[in-house]
């Protein structure tokens, strides 16, 4: 399925096709979608929006919102993201590595990557508390973050060196692009 340009591509028809088979029960379709940007002005290489969904058919147990992460509308940011393969890395993490870790990540419903365009449709976790960069985290928040980071790193320590798309610290394509 070809990726439309986002955010205007988030139509009920597109979302029904992309969420069918993984998120939507058979015979259920997205009938209406409304989009609210999240973190406006804070995203660097991608844009993020909350998509509020209405359904036609059996929607029992379905969340009525998903988070969409998609290629930046800013051409400079998009160019930098492509230079560092950020869209490929994001989609491949969700498809290939997320299933291998016990770290708490959102559930991924759909990923798509085409040239300089990408989209990830994932679980809406906006009800979770987000830390404050100015104030800092509480002890409990810090402990939780360290526990989750430990799970993430333990899952992949010395296990992804053969994956060309996972950046290393030295001698990587990222070092070459820093000139």
Stretch-by-stretch model annotation:
Residues 36-179:
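Conserved ATP-binding subdomain of kinase catalytic cores across diverse folds
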Residues 1-34:
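Juxta-kinase regulatory segment immediately upstream of eukaryotic protein kinase catalytic domains
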